[in-house]
């Protein structure tokens, strides 16, 4: 009899947990996530960000600088063997340049620029997502390398789809999987986040991205010369 009661209690607890998980909504998960990373008000104060990083490739350290001016420009710059390459995205245009095989920047296809517009958003897709025109669906619980995560599906106005995995215990972002279509082909990109750090501005930020990119320092709301987002002629 005791065994039967214990079994019933165990099953009840298990079912209660599952019902509780299913009962949660996307907005519930988003609210807890935003609270965990410093709160939406602190993130909305950020208008510019410059990240000085190191990317490891075949045992070699590659300096990387990522600069974002909220809603205006994104620039990814890396230096290998004395050659500096970059990719620039603005609200309407984009360019890429690799001095090893180009004499001048190449304009990015219109579709590529459209799909990359979310890079101009420092806040990310979960803050004011409805106002941004995003649609988010809660897909329940999933496992990411042993970590129980809440799974959210984000559909952006550009047509890009992103699946977001949020740690069910601390509500930090663990992984994103982006899906886009280019030239009729579906492409997927997985990004993993870690080493969350409290910054003076009141936000919590992942200093490790994808296991290969480490952020050494972050400059927030420092003056950014907008000319770095223009194509050099």
Feature-to-residue mapping (PLM):
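N-terminal secretory signal peptides that target proteins for export/translocation
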Residues: 1-2
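Flexible, processing/modification-adjacent segments and terminal tails
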Residues: 22-35, 42, 93-160, 181-186, ...
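Gly/Pro-enriched, hydrophobic low-complexity segments
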Residues: 147-232
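N-terminal mature ectodomain segment of secretory-pathway/periplasmic proteins
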Residues: 27-101
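C-terminal segment of classical bacterial N-terminal signal peptides
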Residues: 14-21
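Generic beta-strand structural signal
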Residues: 68-70, 88-89, 138, 166, ...
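Well-ordered beta-strand positions enriched in small/hydrophobic/aromatic, beta-favoring residues
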Residues: 51, 76, 87, 94, ...
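Sec-dependent N-terminal signal peptides
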Residues: 6-14
